């Protein structure tokens, strides 16, 4: 749709659907009230959130990049990558505050709904802000020159170069980012709580600090990609993740065990945070240039569909299934670390493929 009717209309549709679905979760009836319809409604709303988020991520990347111009494009567009960690940070803070002021019974009864109610305010602000946005200059030029494609997705699959770049985006950039996001932002907390048995409050504190560290690291990676190119930065992040994941989680277990043995000593916590920050570096190197790369890889007339499809497939197939695969391997091998070989091998393979085939796009014109 973004290649046919414009970047801005799709931008408006996705935020409206996502916001309404999120707000509705906060008003869902319980199983005791409506029975089986409660989980059915929840799954339906989650699917709607997923579908709208799919259009949002690729569409916002194209929209922002086409407005960014040619100078410091990587740095300007890297701000978009902060939104995911920022959401995790605010949700963690909300839950921490609610748990602090509410009893466990109150939180289970209605407290969990509060973040979903608050999202109504965010939805109103987002819709008003986006109504003031302008269509991208690239799409306006396409419309004036009658270069728009009626079947952009079909055109993408017919063009050999576009097909190749869609695969590279899927396998190396988007899947690599999804794998690292899971390992750095999601699995570290699960691992520290379930395997190491650290107190949830301590884990939440560590997660907040590591997420805060991710913000400047991501912006720096985007800026650095403007200086040395997107390709070397992305490959560095993939390689660093492949090398560092296994030893990092082993260090997390060792340091966490030391902390449990002497909880009044802060040194293990400081080193735990350093390990988490090291993992954040690998994630930042991949996602920092990612927004610009999504748009720069493809021609303007089919850019939105060419960037959105592989990016969403990578998030769903690779990122979405990663927790299941890691957990299954851990159970089969009876180890807390065995499953981590899957993301390690995936990242190493992605780095090799990117080194061999990923083109440098830093100086590409977005009007072509």
Annotate each language-model stretch with its function.
Residues 131-152, 364-368:
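Flexible cytoplasmic inter-helical loops of multi-pass small-molecule transporters
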Residues 16-35, 239-264:
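C-terminal ends and interior cores of transmembrane alpha-helices
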Residues 84-130:
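Helix-loop-helix hairpin linking two adjacent transmembrane segments in secondary transporters
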Residues 4-15, 227-238:
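Cytoplasmic membrane-interface "Motif A"-like loop-to-helix N-cap segments
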Residues 34-54, 260-285:
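Hydrophobic core of transmembrane alpha-helices in multi-pass small-molecule transporters
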Residues 301-333:
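A late C-terminal transmembrane helix in Major Facilitator Superfamily
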Residues 75-99, 122, 310-322:
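Glycine-rich segments within core transmembrane alpha-helices of 12-TM secondary carriers
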Residues 162-214, 318-323:
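Extracytoplasmic gate region of multi-pass secondary transporters
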């Amino acid at each position: 749709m973004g290649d046919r009717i414009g970047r801005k209309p799709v931008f408006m549709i996705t935020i409206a659907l996502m916001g309404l679905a999120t707000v509705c979760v906060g008003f869902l009836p319980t199983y005791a009230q409506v029975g089986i319809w409660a989980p059915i409604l929840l799954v339906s709303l989650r699917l709607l959130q997923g579908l709208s988020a799919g259009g949002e991520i690729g569409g916002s990347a194209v929209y922002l990049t086409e407005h960014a111009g040619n100078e410091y494009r990587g740095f300007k567009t890297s701000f978009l990558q902060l939104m995911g960690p920022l959401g995790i940070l605010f949700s963690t803070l909300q839950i921490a505050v609610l748990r602090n002021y509410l009893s466990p019974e109150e939180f289970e009864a209605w407290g969990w709904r509060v973040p979903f109610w608050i999202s109504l305010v965010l939805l109103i602000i987002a819709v008003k802000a986006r109504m003031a946005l302008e269509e991208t200059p690239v799409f306006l030029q396409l419309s004036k020159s009658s270069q728009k494609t009626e079947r952009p997705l079909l055109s993408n699959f017919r063009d050999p170069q576009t097909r190749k770049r869609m695969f590279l985006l899927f396998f190396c950039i988007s899947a690599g980012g999804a794998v690292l996001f899971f390992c750095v932002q999601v699995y570290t907390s699960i691992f520290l709580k379930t395997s190491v048995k650290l107190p949830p409050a301590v884990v939440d504190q560590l997660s907040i600090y590591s997420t805060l560290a991710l913000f400047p690291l991501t912006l720096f990676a985007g800026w650095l990609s403007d200086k040395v190119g997107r390709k070397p930065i992305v490959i560095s992040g993939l390689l660093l993740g492949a090398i560092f994941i296994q030893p990092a989680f082993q260090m997390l277990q060792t340091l966490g065990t030391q902390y449990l043995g002497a909880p009044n000593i802060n040194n293990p916590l400081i080193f735990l945070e350093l390990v988490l920050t090291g993992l954040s570096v690998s994630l930042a190197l991949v996602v920092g240039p990612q927004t610009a790369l999504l748009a720069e890889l493809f021609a303007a007339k089919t850019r939105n569909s060419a960037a959105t499809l592989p990016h969403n497939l990578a998030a769903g197939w690779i990122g979405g299934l990663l927790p299941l695969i890691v957990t299954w391997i851990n159970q089969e091998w009876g180890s807390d670390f065995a499953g981590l070989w899957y993301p390690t091998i995936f990242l190493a393979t992605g780095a090799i493929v990117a080194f061999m085939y990923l083109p440098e796009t830093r100086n590409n014109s977005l009007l072509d």
